[in-house]
Amino acid sequence: MVAETIAKYGRLDVLVYNSGAIWWASVAKSPMKRFQLMQRVNVEGLYGVVQACLPHFEQSDGTWRGRIIIVSPPIYSRFFRGKTAYAMGKVGMSVLTKGLAMDFQREGKSEMAVTSIWPATAVQSAATQNMAQEDAKDLRTANVFSDAVLQMIKAPVEEVNGELLLDEDFLRMKGVSDFEKYNLVEGSRPRRIMPAVFPDLRVKEQDDEGRRVDSTKLGASRL
């Protein structure tokens, strides 16, 4: 897929990872095959695509330039409830956003940004197609999501790199105030499903790395 993109367009500017597998149930009711599928699609799939794309963000002059958008949530404990197996993968995707952003900063790649996006309300998609008809009033169209993605791609690196953002909140920050146009059912008021405030994942010792270890310099890997 990446090779075909480069062959056709000669460059890569943006990666949006929107693939996903979903299974919401307790641990006892989440069989291993479901768990493994979600990890392969959500976590391994993301990691593999990012690894394949990264070299193509390097420019001919040695600088790096590009944007990566990942569909994964802010990290908070309520998200784990009733869907632990699913949450393990989606939160892992958000960890990649945080960690890769740190890589960009440490390596001086000041024109690279990776950002996670998640819906503030339920959005019309394959994941919501089985909702009861009377619940359609709580859905927004996918346009709210795509509009937010476009704004993230255009935003300054320092504004979005390493951020775990909600579509509505980011659009409001960018000056959007009319959200009725996104409602699936005219005149409805979709219920917000995400918290208003999220925990700060940083610690006082955030910049203290201790003795930094680079496994690539410790000899040949046994894998």
What are these regions (language model features)?
Residues 1, 16, 48-53, 57, ...:
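Hydrophobic positions on the long internal alpha-helix
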Residues 21-36, 55, 59-63, 82-85:
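Conserved mid-core segment of classical short-chain dehydrogenase/reductases
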Residues 7, 41-63, 101-106:
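Amphipathic alpha-helical dimer-interface segment in Rossmann-like NAD(P)H-dependent oxidoreductases
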Residues 58-108, 118-123, 129:
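Catalytic loop of short-chain dehydrogenase/reductase
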Residues 12-20, 42, 70, 115-116:
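Rossmann-fold scaffold of SDR-type NAD(P)-dependent oxidoreductases
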Residues 21, 28-47, 69, 93:
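Catalytic Tyr-X3-Lys loop
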Residues 39-46, 50, 81, 89, ...:
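Short alpha-helix in the Rossmann-fold core of NAD(P)-dependent oxidoreductases
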